[in-house]
A protein has these predicted regions:
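Non-catalytic, mostly N-terminal accessory regions of nucleic-acid modification and defense proteins
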Residues: 1-161
Length: 161
């Protein structure tokens, strides 16, 4: 395994442990595992989306973000991603963008909920819809155990970085 992959895995592991420790004080282990597992899976889907888009757009020399902002490209990449992946994560909802929001202290739980909703909505009417039904339902993002308000909840998750 190359060093960059090992470093990336170690960083992810450290962030997940930090998230677990931040949530541990507010809820039981069986409760916070739902958040951790949901975030791991969202990370996986986001990473897969980014790699897919890099490969899809490499010959066109355009970024995913730029392609998304061009209506013709957007229609084509949405169609391709839904056919090949069964879902699409919009550029603004990529996991790495959320990490930057956390670092900039602009992240909140409501944004994560919008990201998950957009992902789930992308599967509606596709063969993958049934596979995704209820996938993130155990992540109760409106739970007061994450904080009393959206911003406090976001602050609690900010501790993970």
């Amino acid at each position: 395994m190359d060093n960059s992959i090992q470093a990336h895995q170690k960083e992810l592991c450290n962030k997940l442990w930090a998230m677990a420790n931040a949530l541990r004080g507010n809820m039981e282990a069986y409760e916070f595992k739902n958040y951790i597992l949901g975030m791991i899976f969202y990370y996986y889907l986001s990473d897969k989306t980014e790699k897919y888009m890099v490969n899809l757009l490499k010959d066109d020399n355009i970024s995913y973000e730029d392609a998304w902002n061009d209506e013709e490209y957007k229609a084509a990449i949405v169609e391709e991603a839904l056919r090949d992946l069964g879902y699409i994560i919009e550029p603004e909802y990529l996991f790495r963008k959320m990490v930057k929001m956390v670092e900039n202290r602009s992240f909140d739980i409501e944004f994560l909920q919008k990201a998950i909703n957009a992902l789930m909505e992308s599967t509606i009417g596709n063969d993958s819809q049934e596979d995704f039904d209820g996938l993130f339902s155990d992540m109760q993002l409106d739970s007061t155990k994450l904080g009393h308000t959206v911003k406090v909840g976001g602050h609690g998750l900010r501790k993970t970085n």
